Design a protein with these regions (language model features):
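Short, highly charged C-terminal tails/helix-capping segments
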Residues: 74-78, 172-186
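Hydrophobic residues positioned within well-ordered beta-strands of beta-sheet architectures
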Residues: 35-37, 86-88, 99, 122, ...
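Hydrophobic/aromatic beta-strand elements that line small-molecule binding cavities or substrate pockets
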Residues: 39, 74-77, 97-102, 120-128
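Hydrophobic ligand-binding cavity/cleft-lining segments
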Residues: 7-10, 14-76
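Beta-strand/loop substructures that line and gate deep hydrophobic ligand-binding cavities in soluble
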Residues: 114-166
Length: 186
């Protein structure tokens, strides 16, 4: 297990930067990779989800991501800081992380990686209204030891984008199963 490291991120700066799909910023020796994707929640032929169902799904995912994120093999809440905020340990892509979870009801859940080999911030945001509901998954991650503009950086960013798009699809699928009254595996 990695030692806990204090990490903070300016969400206002993060939101301004999230207007593009992918880019990086040098942060000292390391590179911070920014990726954002916005996807429609309600595709034709799928179980319709309203804002409340999506919010409830994001809260469930924050507490136990295993049914929602295929690449995650372990998820355990380790400390509660308030009625809504907490820390959790996860295993993702065969690596252990500690994340601080901050739900901002009813529109965004922020996951701040405070320990592990890749630090940064991940946000899951509900956007627009029920007629055109969208889910934005964004991340700003510092990858230690990866040179900017390198093939390694592009490969890492590409694999993360692929993992997060799979997680979005799995998350929406789990939310639809819940909305349809079907059980979601724990």
């Amino acid at each position: 297990m990695h030692a806990k490291t204090a990490y903070s991120f300016d969400m206002g700066a993060y939101e301004r930067l999230m207007r593009r799909d992918y880019y990086h910023v040098r942060t000292g020796r390391n590179i911070m990779i920014f990726v954002t994707r916005q996807l429609p929640v309600n595709e034709p032929g799928e179980t319709h989800l309203d804002r409340a169902a999506v919010w409830d799904g994001l809260v469930l995912k924050a507490n136990n991501a295993l049914p929602f994120v295929p690449s995650m093999t372990f998820c355990e809440v380790t400390a509660r800081h308030s009625d809504t905020g907490f820390d959790r340990d996860i295993d993702f892509r065969r690596q252990r992380f500690t994340e601080r979870i901050t739900p901002e009801a009813p529109h965004r859940v922020v996951f701040t990686r405070i320990a592990g080999p890749v630090l940064g911030t991940i946000a899951n945001e509900i956007e627009d209204d029920d007629d055109d509901l969208r889910l934005r998954f964004s991340f700003a991650l510092t990858v230690e030891g990866v040179a900017g503009c390198s093939a390694a950086e592009q490969e890492y960013a590409g694999s993360m984008i692929g993992d997060y798009l799979k997680a979005v699809a799995a998350t929406l699928g789990a939310m639809r199963r819940i909305a349809a009254g079907k059980a979601v595996p724990a």
